[in-house]
Amino acid sequence: MQHTGTVLRMMGRQRLLSKAVRSVISPRQIFSHSHLKIDVSLYVEKEAALHPNQIAFKSKLKDHFSLSQLNNISVDDIDKFMALSVNSEDLSTACEMIAAYLGDKDLHILHPKADLDLLNSYTCVCHILGNPKEAILLWNQPQVRDVIHKSSSKQLYLALIIYLDLLQKHGMYNELLEMYRFLADQRPELIRQSRKIALLVMLALYKEGTPESLSQSLLLLGQHQKNKGNQKMVISPALIAYNLGQHAKAYSILQHFGTSASSNLLIQSLEMMALSKAGKLDQALEVLREFLPRRSRRRAADGDPPAK
């Protein structure tokens, strides 16, 4: 009991762990616009920033599309319309235009690369404006799923990252996992080859928190062995196991996939809590003894007084 009290006091009765977990797992944008290769300067975010000529162009294009679909609208017109989109109504219209383009075989022959260009631009605008539901409308289109199935372009990979990051940022985990399962069935190599996709999927699996989620997370982690030490990728399945009451497994995950380079307060804290919950109090204290000198050295290097 004395050991248990020591561990729990050092862990602040799990409050420290919970706070650290929220900082890593909470809904937020995982990758910056720069990291996602989104050039924000190419898009208009607010209605007030539009020039009267741009407003007139948008209105005219909407009228053309309403009356005759794409008969009087070029691919460049669609792309320009998206760059000037500032709200969900604009995005819904843009989505309908892209769907009409994807359904026109003649336009595919005339503009063979436009499908990915339009998909990428539309997803970028949705990300900038924070409109995941409008993005889902397009990505769920059968024609877009067909593009995903057939394309090997790097542009598809980038669009996927942007889309999944948008879903993660807005807490739409079911939709993210639906896309993951589609990719696992149709394009599994994209998941195997992309650490970014795997990370976003694993964060969503953590939120799902089922035994199947744990199995899927471990499968993904095993496919990305070369990325050992990535804190978020290691911590997600460990937390799933911990929350499911599989404390010994949680500790094993941290030991097997973690490295000394990735070992930090969050990982060390979870190791101690998992061992304590599993009744291995002596091992938990060993982890604590190893961690405290390391933490003191870090504080000294930063010019802070040693921890008491």
Describe each PLM feature range.
Residues 1-308:
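A basic, Ser/Thr-enriched alpha-helical scaffold prevalent
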